[in-house]
Each structure stands twice: as C-alpha cells, then as structure tokens.
Swiss-Prot record:
Residues 5-407 form the BRO1 domain. Residues 974-984 have a biased composition (Low complexity). The lineage of its organism: Eukaryota, Fungi, Dikarya, Ascomycota, Pezizomycotina. Involved in concentration and sorting of cargo proteins of the multivesicular body (MVB) for incorporation into intralumenal vesicles. Residues 789-818, 862-874, 904-925, 948-973 have a biased composition (Polar residues). It is found in: Cytoplasm; Endosome. GO terms for cellular component: endosome. Residues 720-786 form a coiled coil. Residues 755-995 are annotated as: Disordered. The gene is BRO1. Keywords: Coiled coil, Cytoplasm, Endosome, Protein transport, Transport. This is Vacuolar protein-sorting protein BRO1. Residues 772-786 have a biased composition (Basic and acidic residues).
Length: 995
C-alpha cells in the first residue's frame, strides 16, 4: 500500500574553514599557555568541522555527527570568544533553498546553521521511513517532532537571521509542516489499529489544522521564491485531505450516535474537500525540482491517495443518504451550520535537551576538548564556591569536635568506663604497675652501680692527694738544703731563698687541698643520698634484671596495705561484687549492664558521627562544579549565590545526620548520668567503692615512692658523673703542678751546684791572689830601693770585672683568684696552647733537639728558653741580689749571677737574655744554656672547680679566656737524659741528704 509522501528540508552547504591557527594564537595571547599542548584538540575540532560537510541526510550517524560538532561548539563558546574582535574566523554557509552564500564571523551563525542541518537531517530521516513497519513509523513520528523542536530552538535563540532559510517566518512555516506531518503519522498508526471513529476524527482535525497553518507560511515563502511551488501544492492537498478525513470519521461517529442527518451533512462536506484535494493532486507535476527534496513519484502517490479517499467518502455518503431517506428521515443541516470537529494534538516540538532522551549524551558529543582551559571568571567563581564549602565543613567539624569533647568530659567526670571495670572485675588489674614504673627499673639497671663509682672516686682522690704530698715534700726538701748551704757559707751563698719563690706553688697546693676538701663534703652528700635510697635502687635493679618489675610493685602495694590502719584482705581474696546481690531492687549486674549498653550506644554514635564527617570532607573535596560554572558562565553573574546555594544542598543529608547524632547523644548522656548515679547510690557499690579508693591511694603512694627514688637516682648519677669529670680534670691539674715542682727543684739544684762550684773556685783564687800581692809588695820595695828612675810600680789589675746587675721590672701573669662555693662545676682552666702563650708570648716552642752550651749572642730566630736558668747567675765576681722590690724574674736583662729577689713569686715573661759562664774572664753577653738543662713548664693554673667553687677572673693583660684548659708541660726525652747525666756529675747532689 502506497504511503502518503512527506516534505523534508534540504541541508545547508558550507565552505571549509581552519580552526587550528586562530585557536592557538588566542591560547598563547590570552591564557599564556603553550598552544602546542592543545594541538591535538584543535585538530580534532577542525576534523569535526570537515566531517559535518559530508554528513548523511537520512541516517542517524549524520545526525550524531552534526550534534557532536554542535556540542563542541557550545563548550567552545564558554571559553573562546569567536567574533570579529577576538578569534576571527569567517563562516560561509549557503542558503538551503536559494543557495545564496552568507559569511559571518559570529559563532552563533555557525551554531544556527548546524542546528538547521540537524533539523533537516531529522526531517529527511523521518520522510524516508517505511511507515508500514511499526518501528519505522515510530521513528518517523519522533524525528518529525524532534525536527520541529530544533527549528523552534533556532527561532527562540537566534533572533537576527543573516539568511532567508533562518528567518523567523521561514522557520515558523517549517515548524508547522513538521508538526502536521508528525500528527499525520500518528493518525496513520491509529487508523491501522482501527481505533474508534471519534478519536480518529479529532486526530485528523488537528492534522488538517496544522496543515492549514503551514499553508500560510508556505504560500508566503513560495511567493518570495524561497520554497518550491510543489511544497505549496502538497500542503494544499494535505490540508484538504486531512480536513475531509476529519469530517468522514466524525460522520461515522455521528451514525453510531443515531445522528444520521448530521452524518449525511458531514459526509457531503467531506466529499467536497476530497474533490478539492483530488483536483489539486491532478495538477501536481509529474517531475519535481531537485531542491524540493521530494521523490519523483510523489505526484502519483498523492493522486492515488486522494482518489481512494474520495471513493470511500462517496460510497459512505450514498449509503447514508439511502438509509436516511428510507429509514431515519433526519434533516440534513447545511455545511455552515455543522459544528467544527474537535481537535486532539498528538505532536509537539521535542526540546533539544530531550533529543537524546535515555541515551548517553557524553558518548555522542565526546569529551570536552578544551576541558583543561578554565576561564578566569570561572576560576574566580570556583574559588568562591570552594570557600563556601570550606565554611560549611569547618562549621560541621566544630560541631563534631564540640560534641566529642562534651562526651569525653562527661565520661571523664563520671570516671567511665573505668569505674565499671573496677566494679565488674575487682582490683587485680589495678595492682599492676604502669609502663613508667617498668621503665624506671630498666633505667636503674642500665646505669653503673653508684657504689662502684664511689670507689673509683675515692681511689682517684687518694691518688691526687699523694701527688700533692709528694710535691710538698720536694719543695720542703729543696728549701731545707738551700738554708743549710746559706748557714754554712753565710754571705757567700747568694742564692735567692726558696720561700720567696715557691709562694705560688705552695698556694696552688693549698688551694687544691681546699678544693679536695670541698669535693669530699660534696661526696659525702652524695653518699648520704645513696645510703637513704640504696635499698630502693637495689630492688629496682634486681627486678629489672630478673624481669620481676610487676612482682616488685605488687609486693610494695601489699606492704603499703599491711601498714594501713585498716588492713584488708588481698585483692584476690575480695568477694566479687557481682556475686553479692542481697539488696532489694535491681541487681548490681543489671545496673552495670544497663550503663554499659548506654556507653555502647554513645560510642556507636561517636563513630558514626566521625564517619559522616569524614564522608562530608571527602565529598566536599571531590566536589568540582567547574563544568557547571562553565556551562552557566554567561549568566553566572546574575544568580551566582543562588547557584552556590543550590549546589551546597548536596551536602544537606550529611548535615542532617550529624545534627541527629548530636540530639541522640544529648538524650543518651542524660540517661547515662541517671543510671550511673543510681548505681553509685547502691550500698553494695558504695562499700566496694571505698575499698577501691583505699587501694588506689596505696597504689599511688607506691608509685610516688619509686618515682621519688628514681628521681634521686638520676640526681645521684648526674652528681657522680660531674664528680668523676671534676676529679679527672683535677688530676690533670695536679700532674701539671707536679711537673712544675720537679722543674723548679731541678733548676734550683743546678743553680746551687754552680754557685757552690764558684765559691770553691773563688776561695782558691783568693789564696793565690794573696801570695801574688806579697810578691808584688816585695818587688815594689826592691824597686824603690833600686836607683833606676824608669821603673815604676805596676798597677794591680782586676782579674775579673764586676758586671753591673741589670734588672727590668716585668709583669708576669698572676693566677686568677678562686672563690670556693662548694658545688661541682666543670673546671674552667686555660687550654695548654693558650697557657703556653700566656707564659711565653715572645718565644717559639722549644726545639726537640738537645741544647748545647753556647757563648756569644744567639743568632736571629734562635730559640732562647725564657725560664729560670742558673747558669746566668754565676758569681762573676760575686752574687748580686736583686733589689728588694723586685717581684718577678727579668730573664732578658741579667748580666751576672743573681737569684730572684726575696719577694718574687712568679717567673716573669721577658726577652731573650745573655749570661756569664763559670770562667773568671768576661764573656760576651749571649744565650748560655747549661748542658742538660730542661726549661720548666709554665706555672699551673688554678685548680678545677670543686665543690662550691667559682672562678672570678679579673682583667689581666695577655691572659687567656678563663674557660680554657690547664697548661701541660712535657719534657723532651733527650733533655731528660741530659738532666740525668748532669745530676750524676752534680757536686751539690750530695746535699740532698742533709737533714
């Protein structure tokens, strides 16, 4: 059976354009991004544009291709302004009917043309369906409505049409044609389903009405030479045919209602309209223009359709007239007096948003090509939205924290759930110590036993005292030998008294002894602390080594309980409270279970609340409305706050759940407080509570005891370590003092030996001098008795000149004064290098080679040890003591043998000096050093800071920092060997045995 032909809209043609370069240029200039990053996206868009030029007009693939490109244009318009001022691209399209070209730089023109082609493709696809099949008929019905919807979108959104095919009049006419054809297709389906004539009449009446509306627009466009004339003929045929069908089916409905006269009148009207349709169909040309988009046999189909309908109407009219004339005799009304047939719309424009109803639009349009590019305005709006989200999350988090804090505070005030554990399980678990106690025992065990430390300190102190005793004995022995020699030789013994030279050394020894006394007192304090806590220390040490810290704690608690005035039985023997339910009312176990149930509910609410908050934070973090903001970019400024409020509503369920959790918690906390108070008021619970508090006090007392012992142990270990360091530093100091004493004694012994040798030589020389003088006197007498006047008495010559003693007052650095405060402190002594510089600022370090005796001035840069050198104080001709006010040696200025003055107490710093030898002949001033002489080290510094000691340093010239280490002197091995050899040949060495 031939089906009614349908009108389809031709597609607009277009020229090729280039999207790539303009887009890249705009990305680089406006967004400041590398355009090559978007090369693929630009190429994809350009390829879509090329594909739409060849889109098929009668297939769904062509429709999808056009829609995909249109969707990308919509997304592109949200990021790129395509117009004459920004991205300038000329879009050229040809009119679908007149084929005239139109070029514009507006993206709206490009989108309108694409939508027009989508509508055209939909109409072509609908017209090409074989409506004999139900699925094809439904497709045609849907596509005609969708085409009308797309044309409606053009009319509503593109107001200024640049071409005639996009004008409002043309598009409106096309909308009516598409809707009329959709209504006709629906009517065909109802006719095929043999629906009631009344329904068919209404559907046909609506179709005829739509064709009549379309006829006006088509007539106007044909007049303007836009549409082909065959469209006008076809619209006229369809209008008359559908109106005739409406009258025909309404007549059948009237006959069913016994309205035979009215039925005859309607059939007569239907015949008139059918004849008019047949007449126009006969005038339809056999060949149609290509631009009309109609098939070549369209005219034949229309003629056959109208002829068949006219035959049907005439046959029914004859039958109705016959029946009415012979049977019913009803009056036949005139055509003008007939009521209009009611209309039933069955077709309406399908909006663009419903074009792909039930399908994945994202799959058809594809992903947003330029999703990585976000406009600045959208970024700002997204930031504002993020801040709104953050406010919401912060507010909910604060509510959750507040609720959790209130729960924790209430449970802590009620001492739950710990109190329940005590009531249920007794006190066994409370006798166990905490982890701190175990750690205290481990720390005590890891440290060295204080008793061992005390023994080592005592040994160290005894060693230091023995060194000081030895040094004192050496100084006393040297002083005794010197005074015995002075008593023997009287004025001839010119060596400086030792007591004036050993003031500093003896003072240091005295100070060191005092420091040791102070240290002993501090040691006694530490020992007292050890005696007081030694038992606890030993217990903790043994418990840690044997792994019995818990048993130690339990024994201590048991002892504390036994010492109590009201001692109770051990916890293990306490009757269980849960087994002792003898009062009336609810049992204790029931009350405890009730409280535990409430606690479980509270904990469940807390977990649920925390989880809801976590989900809320995660959802807010993942919530990104950038795409929504982009889609609404053009209107976001008008309703931004409204959009934010709408989007934040998605978090409302989480907020409601948190609010409900808080309400539940408040109710449960009230119930918990009431139930727990009733439990505590039970006499059985009160009795056990009193016992528990007693045990807790005992446990706390044990904890405090061992905590105090542990703190005492830490203090003791710290004090012993400080004492150990102090004694080690003190030992270094007294060893340095011992070396200085040895050097001083050796130097004095060498000086005394030279002085003794000189005295013996002078006595021998004096005897020879008296004999010579006697001979000279006799010779003089003989000369006077002689008669020769040329002879004269010779003048006696002085055998040796007496060099003037030269003293230069030099200022030697003094030891800093010491203030003893009785506390162990780290000694602040100058380091060896600084102390060496303090004593010998003008000299280089001594050479390690053996020093030989030399006469004459030393060469330049030759080291001359600035120390106390006995060879420089020989009797030439006799000793000359320094002035009484001299307090230090001036080594660089002596020209004769002289001991330090009586009041000198330190070795001075001075320049290099010259000395005289043992010979009676004058010697050139030079650096004479006797064989084997070992220069003594600088005097020692103050003792280390002992108990209650604090050094106070004044402003001393050329002094080192007070925190420096003590100086240490060392004697080269070769010099020690030479000194031993000299002592073997020392004639004064035997004087050491004097008593």
């Amino acid at each position: 059976m031939a089906q009614s032909p349908m009108i389809s809209v031709p597609l607009k043609a277009t020229n090729e354009i280039d999207w790539v370069e303009p887009l890249k240029r705009y990305i680089r200039d406006t967004y400041g991004d590398d355009p090559e990053r978007y090369a693929e996206e630009c190429a994809t868009l350009n390829r879509l544009r090329q594909d739409v030029r060849g889109a098929g007009k009668d297939s769904t693939s062509g429709r999808d291709m056009l829609y995909r490109y249109y969707g990308q244009l919509e997304l592109l318009d949200l990021r790129f302004p395509v117009d004459e001022q920004h991205i300038k691209i000329s879009f050229t399209w040809f009119d679908a009917f007149t084929h005239k070209s139109t070029a514009q730089y507006s993206l709206a023109f490009e989108k309108a043309s694409i939508i027009f082609n989508i509508s055209a493709v939909l109409s072509c696809h609908a017209a090409a369906q074989d409506r004999g099949e139900e699925s094809a008929l439904k497709t045609a019905y849907h596509n005609f409505q969708a085409s009308a919807g797309m044309f409606t979108y053009i009319n509503e959104n593109f107001l200024h049409a640049p071409s005639s095919d996009l004008s409002r009049e043309t598009v409106k006419a096309l909308i009516h044609v598409m809707l009329a054809q959709a209504q006709e297709v629906f009517l065909e389906k109802q006719v095929a389903d043999k629906k009631k004539p009344a329904l068919l009449a209404k559907l046909a009446s609506q179709a005829g009405y739509l064709y009549s509306q379309a006829l006006e627009g088509v007539q106007e466009n044909v007049t303007k030479a836009i549409f082909e004339k065959v469209w006008l003929l076809m619209t006229q045929i369809k209008s008359n045919l559908l109106n005739s069908m409406a009258q025909y089916y309404q007549a059948l409905a009237d006959e069913e209602q016994d309205k035979h006269g009215i039925a005859v009148g309607r059939l007569q009207t239907a015949e008139t309209q059918a004849k008019e349709a047949e007449r126009v169909a006969r005038s339809f040309p056999n060949s149609v223009p290509m631009s009309s988009n109609l098939s070549a046999d369209c005219g034949g189909f229309l003629q056959e359709l109208t002829k068949r309908h006219l035959s049907t109407v005439q046959s029914q009219l004859q039958s109705a007239l016959k029946d009415n004339d012979y049977i019913y005799h009803k009056e036949v009304p005139a055509e003008a007096s007939l009521e209009a047939v009611a209309k039933l719309p069955a077709a309406k424009p399908i909006p663009v948003s419903e074009l792909y109803a039930g399908q994945d639009i994202q799959r058809i349009t594809g992903p947003d090509l330029f999703a990585k590019i976000v406009p600045f305005a959208v970024t700002e709006s997204a930031s504002l939205y993020d801040e709104e989200k953050a406010k919401l999350v912060r507010a909910e988090a604060e509510r959750v924290d507040t609720a959790n804090g209130e729960m924790a505070a209430s449970l802590d005030y009620l001492r739950l759930p710990g109190a329940l554990q005590v009531l249920k399980g007794g006190f066994d678990q409370d006798i166990l110590p905490d982890e701190d106690f175990r750690q205290w025992c481990e720390d005590v065990s890891d440290q060295e036993n204080p008793v061992t430390l005390f023994d080592s300190l005592r040994t160290e102190k005894d060693s230091i005292l023995s060194i000081l005793d030895k040094s004192t004995k050496q100084l006393d022995m040297e002083e005794g030998v010197c005074e015995k020699m002075r008593s023997k030789y009287e004025n001839e013994w010119t060596q400086q008294p030792s007591s004036r030279l050993t003031t500093t050394l003896r003072g240091d020894i005295r100070h060191y002894r005092e420091a040791l006394d102070e240290a002993s007192r501090s040691d006694n304090q530490l020992a007292g602390k050890l005696r007081q806590n030694e038992m606890d220390f030993d217990e903790m040490r043994r418990a840690a080594k044997s792994g019995e810290a818990d048993q130690l704690f339990q024994r201590a608690v048991a002892q504390a309980r036994a010492r109590g005035s009201n001692a109770t039985s051990p916890a293990g023997l306490e009757p269980n409270l849960l087994d002792d339910d003898f009062d009336e009312g609810p049992s204790v176990i029931d009350q405890i279970n009730r409280v535990e149930d409430i606690l479980k509910k509270l904990n469940s609410i807390k977990r649920e609340r925390n989880q809801v908050l976590k989900d809320l934070k995660e959802k807010a973090h993942n919530d990104d409305i950038s795409q929504i903001l982009i889609l609404n970019k053009k209107s976001i400024s008008n309703y931004e706050a409204q959009l934010f409020e709408q989007e934040l509503e998605k978090f409302r369920p989480h907020q409601n759940r948190l609010l409900q959790a808080n309400h539940k918690q408040s109710a449960l906390m009230k119930e918990l407080t009431s139930a727990f108070n009733r439990l505590l008021q039970d006499k059985r619970v009160q009795s056990e509570q009193s016992k528990y508090e007693t045990i807790q006090r005992q446990r706390s007392s044990v904890i405090n005891r061992y905590k105090r012992a542990y703190q005492e142990f830490l203090d003791l270990v710290a004090g012993l370590q400080s004492a150990k360091n102090w004694y080690a530093e003190m030992r270094e100091t007294v060893e340095s003092l011992e070396k200085n004493v040895d050097s001083f004694v050796n130097n004095r012994r060498s000086e005394g030996a030279q002085l003794l040798n000189q005295i013996e030589q002078e006595r021998s020389s004096n005897k020879n001098s008296q004999a010579e003088m006697e001979r000279e006197r006799l010779r003089g007498l003989m000369d006077r008795m002689s008669m020769d006047p040329n002879k004269s008495s010779p003048q006696p010559q002085q055998n040796r000149p007496t060099p003037p003693s030269q003293y230069q007052q030099s200022q030697a650095p003094r030891y800093p004064q010491t203030n003893y405060q009785g506390q162990y402190q780290q000694p602040n002594s100058p380091p060896p290098q600084q102390a060496q510089q303090q004593a010998y600022q003008n000299f280089s370090p001594p050479p390690t080679t053996t020093t030989t005796q030399s006469f004459g001035p030393p060469p330049i840069n030759t080291f001359v040890q600035p120390t106390y050198n006995p060879s420089q104080y020989g009797r030439t001709p006799g000793p000359t003591s320094p002035p009484p006010n001299q307090t230090s040696f001036n080594i660089g200025g002596y020209r004769g043998p002289a001991s330090p003055p009586p009041n000198q107490s330190t070795f001075g710093q001075s320049q290099s000096f010259g000395g005289y030898g043992a010979s009676s002949t004058p010697q050139t001033q030079g650096g004479y050093v006797p064989p084997g002489f070992v220069p003594p080290p600088p005097p020692p510094g103050p003792p280390p800071l002992g108990p209650q000691q604090t050094f106070h340093y004044g402003n001393q010239p050329n002094s080192a920092h007070p925190n420096s280490a003590y100086p240490q002197s060392a004697m080269p091995p070769q010099q020690q060997q030479q000194q031993q050899q000299q002592q073997q040949n020392d004639p004064w060495a035997g004087l050491n045995a004097w008593k």
